[in-house]
Amino acid sequence: VSFLHGATMKKDPLFKGAAGNKYNLRDRKPAFEVKQVDGGLLIGARRNAENDHYYWRVTPFVAPCFTVIPPRGDHPIHGHFWIPIDDHNCMAWSYDYHPVRALSSAEREAMERGEGIHVPYVPGTFRPLQNKDNDYLMDREAQRRGDTYSGIEGFAMQDASVQESMGPIVDRTKENL
C-alpha cells in the first residue's frame, strides 16, 4: 500500500483499524525487496517504524498466477488468481478467508458491495463495472478533494487501471491456452 491506496485504506471496512496501517500511512515510499524462491517470489515492502526498526509486509507470489496478501490485524487474508483466457486477457479471481473463524456477515456484505479487493460487476457478467472502456469511472472531483489519489474507487480497480493501461506485454503466441 502506497500513495495510491492510502485514502482507501482509511475507510475500507476490510482494511481500516489494523495497527499496521499506521506504518503504511506514515511511510508512503516503502523500500521493496524481491527474493526468488522455489515456486515463485517473495515481495517485501519495508517501512520505517519506531526507534530504528522496520515494519515489513511480505507478499508471496506463487508461480504462475497466485498471490496471498498479508493480513491486517484480525481482518481476513486475501489474494488473487490471474487465469489466462486467451492470448491477451486473463480473468482475475479474488478471495478472502480467515484461518480461525468464519467470515462475519459484515465482511461478506462488504465483499459483495465490492469493497476490499473485490469489485462490483456489470450485471449478468464477470466484467468489472469500473473498466478500461469507461476510464474506471474516474472521478476527478473526488481526486481534487483527496478522497482517492487517482480518482478511481477501490483497491482492485486502482491496481487494474495501472496494470491494464500497459496493454498486453507478454508474447503468448507460443503457448497453448
Task: Kindly give the residue locations of the regions a language model identified.
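C-terminal catalytic domain of Rieske-type non-heme iron oxygenases
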Residues: 1-177
